[in-house]
């Protein structure tokens, strides 16, 4: 405070009663975190179904990504638009007469799945195909899914104009993730991608989901992984149309060749397939690219067979029927758990079960009964 005037700050920096020097201020723009600024920006309005379709069918991957985001959304308004886009995409693909190749890919840990997809995918696009890489990862809501990491490792495919990589949708249950992935397949096919890779993350329950939306199922194995045949479930081998022994390079060539022979013999022990295709085992290297042409050749041989004998079409029809029932199951489950009355009741019932006051099946029965009587 100035001793002479009692003002602060002093009007003159030359005031003898103070040693303070007050400089004139410089006007500064308000400091705003760019992230917060962008967060509050007005979100772009939804396009019309016709605009989405025009972008998708012209191969515009930006519009395709926006449409897939609607498919993955749980907002009712988004789902309504998404269902119309899916129906329009199905109609477009049917009219075009294009028969795509949906290839499910799974593998044991350490088989180098993302490296294989990078190498094999690049080889496929070099042959004039357009490739979409999708994933089914029910853990993606917690872990964000390994394909997010895979996408950063698939540098060549990411920069390939004939390739499109989409991370797994984040939805807590396997059923929700699988349904959204299947719908994404439909959009990608309408966008002109004639080869679709559907990747599973690890070897587990998601194989059945991938198999239910794939035409061809490829299992990646390592030589010596889990004592060879003991390291893989019989059911997954039975689903496989081909086994590829990866990392067949360097000092591992001989071991990979021995593993190939072992798996080839094992595949012949399974009953004949409905498609009449005889599953085979091959070796491959993502480093030397050895074996990749042979794998593609065998896959194309498979599609020639099943398109010729009608199995391709009948399997697609059976898959459509399967997903009709899966969609009903998913919708009923969501309707139950998202009901506000049930949301409140279920907490009390859960507590009663945990405290041992009520048996689980009785709690479930009472909750379902209350749910059925809500509209009465």
Predicted regions and their residues:
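Nucleotide-state-sensitive switch-loop elements of NTP-binding domains
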Residues: 48-111, 115, 120-206, 213-220, ...
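Short hinge/gating elements
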Residues: 49-53, 106, 111, 168, ...
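Long, well-ordered amphipathic alpha-helical subdomains in the mid-to-C-terminal portions
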Residues: 64-65, 283, 294-372
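Alpha-helical scaffold elements adjacent to nucleotide-binding pockets in ATP/GTP-utilizing enzyme cores
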Residues: 147, 184, 209, 213, ...
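Canonical P-loop GTPase G-domain recognition
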Residues: 242, 248-305
């Amino acid at each position: 405070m100035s001793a002479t005037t009692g003002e602060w700050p002093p009007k003159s920096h030359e005031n003898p009663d103070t040693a303070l020097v007050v400089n004139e201020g410089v006007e500064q723009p308000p400091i705003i975190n760019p992230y917060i600024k962008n967060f509050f920006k007005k979100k772009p309005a939804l396009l019309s179904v016709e605009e989405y379709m025009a972008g998708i069918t012209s191969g515009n991957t930006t519009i395709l990504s926006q449409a897939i985001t609607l498919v993955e959304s749980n907002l009712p308004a988004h789902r309504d638009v998404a269902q119309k886009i899916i129906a329009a995409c199905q109609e477009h693909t049917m009219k075009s007469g294009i028969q795509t190749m949906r290839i499910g890919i799974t593998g044991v840990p350490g088989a180098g799945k993302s490296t294989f997809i990078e190498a094999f995918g690049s080889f496929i696009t070099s042959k004039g195909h357009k490739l979409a890489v999708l994933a089914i990862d029910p853990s993606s809501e917690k872990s964000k899914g390994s394909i997010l990491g895979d996408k950063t490792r698939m540098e060549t495919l990411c920069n390939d104009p004939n390739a499109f990589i989409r991370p797994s949708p984040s939805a807590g249950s396997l059923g929700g993730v699988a349904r959204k992935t299947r719908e994404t397949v439909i959009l990608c096919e309408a966008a002109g991608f004639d080869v679709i890779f559907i990747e599973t993350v690890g070897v587990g329950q998601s194989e059945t989901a991938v198999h239910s939306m794939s035409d061809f199922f490829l299992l990646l194995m390592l030589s010596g992984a889990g004592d060879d045949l003991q390291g893989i479930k019989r059911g997954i081998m039975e689903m496989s149309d081909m086994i590829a022994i990866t990392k067949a390079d360097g000092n591992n060539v001989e071991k990979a060749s021995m593993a190939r022979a072992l798996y080839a013999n094992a595949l012949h022990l399974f009953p004949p397939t409905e498609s009449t295709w005889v599953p085979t085992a091959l070796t491959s290297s993502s480093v030397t690219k050895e074996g990749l042409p042979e794998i593609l050749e065998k896959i194309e041989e498979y599609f020639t067979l099943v398109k010729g004998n009608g199995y391709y079409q009948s399997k697609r029809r059976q898959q459509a029927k399967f997903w009709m029932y899966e969609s009903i199951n998913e919708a009923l489950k969501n309707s139950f758990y998202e009901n506000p009355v049930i949301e409140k009741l279920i907490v009390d019932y859960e507590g009663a079960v945990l405290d041992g006051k009520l048996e689980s099946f009785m709690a479930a029965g009472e909750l379902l009964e209350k749910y059925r009587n809500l509209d009465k």
